[in-house]
Structures are given as structure tokens and as C-alpha cells.
């Protein structure tokens, strides 16, 4: 077991690898990276493709298992974690575990108010007709191809800040982004103007 390495391939993306440097190597961002200054965090992984021949696999996993429970949670951990004691895999993993342990459980009746799921139907992307999920699969299915969830990290740094995680297939544009919305200033010096949050 000590010789087996399990790696989420999303962690190999350059932008994901640079997230730790942006956070912990940048004196401008780190002091602002908390609930006092950030109103909400949105993490989106949107794909324009359908299941593309992976229907049998995807129909057993869906967007929740295929994307949210691994890739999006990895991005949430990198966004919400505390600085590791040193830059090595063990220290980074320990900080990620602390974030996962701080996630508020979503149970029972709360599930409906904290998450939404859907399935793509036939339509058009970039003017090209595309089949719906069930047409691609060749059978009826209730498997979700889109999922969005509101999460909360209940710790000192992030108390009260919602994290919106969303992912899906056959969406209008392909993107992977982490969006932090900063809080409004306490008093605007520009009368009549309502500045947009950054």
C-alpha cells in the first residue's frame, strides 16, 4: 500500500497547482482570504460535451460522483485550507483533511435547500444540434448530469461564507473557475453609486 499513489488528475492542471502559490506566496491576497472580506465562493466546472461514449460508466456515477465528490472538493480544499507548515504532500493533505472535517453535513430536509440536480436534454451548442443524455445513452435514466450544491466550511476562517459548487455536461460554455466575491465596502464615498462587488 505504501507504494501505491492515488492522484486526482485535476491536481495536475497548471492553474490548480498555481492556486497554492497565489494564496500563500502573495502578501496581497492572503490577508483578505477569509470571511471578513469574502462574501461567497463559487467553484464551477462546466463542460460542453455530453457523455461521449462513456454512458455506461457515467450512468452509474452521475455528476455527483464523477465530478463533485472528488474534483470540486479538491478545489474547495485548496481554496479554503489553512497554510500548510511546509510545502510537501503530507502537510498539504493534512490541511485538506481539516477542511473536509469542517464541512457542514447536509442531512434530511436540508438536502433540498442546499442542492439541485438536473439532466441535459437535446438542444444546440454553437449552432450544432446535440442529443440529450437519454438519447446518447439509448435508454431511460434518472442519472444527474448537472449538480449544484451550497456548502459551508464551519471554521474560524470561513464561518458564514457559502461555497457554491456546480458542475455539469452540455452547458453553454466550457470553463473551470474559482470565483471569490468580496464584500462591499462599509461606506461608499460615491453618492448614488452602488459599486459592484469585486
Model segments located where?
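Secretory/organelle targeting and membrane-embedding segments
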Residues: 2-198
Amino acid at each position: 500500500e505504501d507504494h501505491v499513489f492515488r492522484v486526482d488528475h485535476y491536481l495536475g492542471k497548471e492553474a490548480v497547482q498555481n492556486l497554492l502559490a497565489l494564496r500563500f506566496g502573495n502578501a496581497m491576497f492572503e490577508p483578505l482570504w477569509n470571511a471578513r472580506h469574502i462574501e461567497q465562493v463559487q467553484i464551477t466546472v462546466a463542460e460542453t460535451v455530453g457523455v461521449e461514449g462513456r454512458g455506461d460508466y457515467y450512468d452509474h456515477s452521475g455528476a455527483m460522483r464523477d465530478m463533485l465528490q472528488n474534483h470540486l472538493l479538491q478545489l474547495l480544499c485548496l481554496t479554503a485550507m489553512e497554510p500548510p507548515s511546509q510545502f510537501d504532500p503530507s502537510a498539504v493533505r493534512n490541511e485538506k483533511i481539516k477542511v473536509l472535517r469542517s464541512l457542514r453535513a447536509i442531512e434530511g430536509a436540508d438536502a433540498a435547500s442546499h442542492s439541485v440536480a438536473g439532466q441535459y436534454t437535446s438542444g444546440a451548442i454553437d449552432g450544432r444540434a446535440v442529443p440529450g443524455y437519454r438519447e446518447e445513452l439509448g435508454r431511460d435514466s434518472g442519472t444527474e448530469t448537472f449538480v449544484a450544491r451550497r456548502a459551508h466550511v464551519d471554521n474560524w476562517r470561513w464561518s458564514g461564507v457559502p461555497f457554491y459548487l456546480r458542475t455539469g455536461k452540455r452547458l453553454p460554455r466550457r470553463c473551470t473557475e474559482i470565483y471569490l466575491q468580496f464584500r462591499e465596502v462599509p461606506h461608499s464615498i460615491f453618492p448614488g453609486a452602488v459599486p459592484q462587488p469585486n
